């Protein structure tokens, strides 16, 4: 067999193997996005093991992620110029794109600007970053890695949008 024919045969075998070998969705990086709002009636309380995660009402997450996010504030800072910073930890209970239910934990950092200040003003803008804690995933989020970013949409009622990525391994 000529060298060119052997190479073509090898290439065909490799391509055939790639087409028939299953690629699990869990190995993919999933881009996520959606909206969120606070509602204690929909998200009444954190799961077992996270009893301290009640700094705010439950945060309803809709979109690529469906479920509830619970927060434990660990530190806050504010400045006379109206900057408010908050750090803490969270746990999400829910699913990704209608898949199996599970949980994952995040740490987070929130930054916002208030006018004229935090105590007497109104929020001008806010955002937060939520890296997923490695090894925290259970159920449908076993092996989850990634990050979620939230942005506050300022209006008569503040609403929230998120985007990010989650890799399941």
Language model region names:
Residues 27-169:
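Beta-strand-enriched cores of mature, soluble protein domains
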Residues 8-12, 25-26:
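Compositionally biased low-complexity segments, especially N-terminal hydrophobic helices
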Residues 1-9:
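Bacterial N-terminal signal peptides that target proteins for export
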Residues 20-28:
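Sec-dependent signal peptide cleavage junction
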Residues 10-20:
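Bacterial N-terminal signal peptides
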């Amino acid at each position: 067999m000529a060298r060119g024919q052997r190479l073509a045969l090898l290439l065909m075998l490799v391509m055939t193997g790639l087409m028939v070998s299953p690629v699990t969705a869990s190995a993919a990086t999933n881009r996520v996005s959606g909206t969120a709002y606070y509602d204690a009636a929909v998200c009444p309380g954190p799961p077992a093991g996270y009893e301290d995660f009640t700094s705010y009402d439950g945060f309803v997450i809709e979109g690529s992620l469906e479920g509830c996010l619970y927060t434990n504030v660990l530190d806050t800072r504010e400045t006379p110029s109206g900057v408010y910073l908050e750090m803490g930890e969270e746990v999400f209970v829910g699913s990704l794109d209608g898949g199996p239910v599970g949980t994952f934990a995040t740490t987070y950092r929130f930054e916002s600007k208030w006018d004229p200040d935090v105590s007497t003003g109104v929020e001008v803008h806010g955002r937060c970053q939520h890296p997923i804690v490695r090894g925290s995933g259970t159920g449908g989020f076993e092996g989850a890695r990634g990050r979620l970013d939230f942005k506050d949409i300022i209006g008569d009622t503040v609403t929230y949008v998120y985007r990010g990525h989650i890799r399941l391994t």
